[in-house]
Amino acid sequence: MTELKNDRYLRALLRQPVDVTPVWMMRQAGRYLPEYKATRAQAGDFMSLCKNAELACEVTLQPLRRYPLDAAILFSDILTIPDAMGLGLYFEAGEGPRFTAPVTCKADVDKLPIPAPEDELGYVMNAVRTIRRELKGEVPLIGFSGSPWTLATYMVEGGSSKAFTVIKKMMYADPQALHLLLDKLAKSVTLYLNAQIKAGAQSVMIFDTWGGVLTGRDYQQFSLYYMHKIVDGLLRENDGRRVPVTLFTKGGGQWLEAMAETGCDALGLDWTTDIADARRRVGHKVALQGNMDPSMLYAPPARIEDEVATILAGFGQGEGHVFNLGHGIHQDVPPEHAGAFVEAVHRLSAQYHN
């Protein structure tokens, strides 16, 4: 494989020395960029964009042409696994993702296949290989998946939800069915991420977008337990190099200690967690990624710079910080504000690495 020219991101995840704090943005390939909108229009619809390796590669690379980001992230969707299980994924305008055949009971769970990563999900692996080739070793490529709990919320609710009453009804009234579903998803995610690593992903991230809607006890049983299983089953080295794993539970700031016990290399923080506090609690064990409020990118560049300075000072001297937003970039953010953010991270962070 091509020699990596910029390995800051991978080094920071392993708490190794870097010259400046690495930075990337969740959803950095997305609708805030006019060139993304043009490519998506060319593809026809969102899943067609995901399933075309050349176009998925193009949108993955677009933000790297604009900004000196320290990592690329595979352009895909967290719902590829449920889609490959045959639930009939479609996108409703203004509604987000929906499934024609949601999971309602144990019998439905029993019928679900575990998708073969190089077969039903082969288009994702083709995209990974294409992106790695086109990156030419400039920066590392991040692969990802949704967490079992987060995937299950969409599969049981039939799409996006605000109150999560349908899946919580299953959790409390038929926990066995939900555990069977989560176990099947954990196996599927492990296979899927390992296939991404074999195809060329140099780091992987598990997005637990909806873990924060659970009580602490339920989070341990229904979300964290299954992420731990995945971490245990992942390839941790490929191509002679360690493959770091990041866990991110949105709304999970109160559970960082438990998350750090999974054996992951890094934890993603949302913007509601104080990064100085997080470092005191778990910084001896894991790297931290985050955690500027994505809405800060609406502010003037001088205000963005102040916020970057505050977060860098909060983390403090030394290694183990990847700068990011606390969640995905909003679609109506001015692209030049994202540029000011990335530039400020690199310029202001050098003083913390000497």
UniProtKB/Swiss-Prot annotation:
HAMAP family: URO_D. This is Uroporphyrinogen decarboxylase. Keywords: Cytoplasm, Decarboxylase, Lyase, Porphyrin biosynthesis. SUPFAM superfamilies: UROD/MetE-like (SSF51726). It comes from Salmonella schwarzengrund (strain CVM19633). Belongs to the uroporphyrinogen decarboxylase family. It is found in: Cytoplasm. Homodimer.
